[in-house]
């Protein structure tokens, strides 16, 4: 979404987004604290994705106990970002609260997706998908804070660098 300025009012948001904002307020009441005279902006990020994992040997059709299992994850994530530049500080801060829901196993359609790409590119297909992890729901909630040294002004031409410190808690 575009950056939003000022106080958040969940009742003014579309219902699913408003529910998510209320959930964040319940799970982490301090997230919506007033930033006072500190400049702050916020936005919502929606992620949809698929991850897949396979053992190293693509030709084996049996379960390989000492290798990574066949697994897929199909997920939808909502992340709320708040960017704050404390007045007296020499850094910017990004606070993120993210909720990810998904499915693991055949419901993730990882085998079908991988086979589609492998057929289209003429790559040998993996043969052991019958041994993938079973269907189950996936859930993750993340709280993260990132710090970046603040540099005022426009981007300078040429090479540059960034140092971003962070800490996070992920449950799920």
Region annotations inferred by a language model:
Residues 30-172:
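Outer-membrane pore/translocation modules
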Residues 1-22:
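N-terminal ordered "arm"
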